Amino acid sequence: MRDPNRTYPFCRELATIWSEKYPDLRFGQLMYNFIVWCSNTKKRDIFFPEEKEFMELFKEFCGVEEGE
């Protein structure tokens, strides 16, 4: 079983990036754009990545540099 304590740090990081990079988008809009980008640009099905890889992809999509 995956560590249930992973969800809040993941969600906090996602919320921080969302509010800093795309504050005008609704969550559904942001996720739709991200999922399409993953599919078309990265050739990845977003169903499969664990949270670490998901966040790496999300940061790349949002243009977040390491250390930001």
Question: Predicted segment positions?
Answer:
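Catalytic phosphate/metal-binding cores of nucleic-acid and nucleotide-processing enzymes, i.e., regions
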Residues: F27-T41, D45
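Generic structural signal for hydrophobic core residues of well-folded globular domains
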Residues: W18-K21, F34-C38, F61, E65
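Charge-rich, solvent-exposed alpha-helical interaction surfaces
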Residues: F10-E13, I17, N33, L57-E60
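Short, charged early-sequence alpha-helical segments and their helix-coil boundaries
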Residues: N40-E68
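N-terminal acidic leader/helix
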Residues: M1-F27
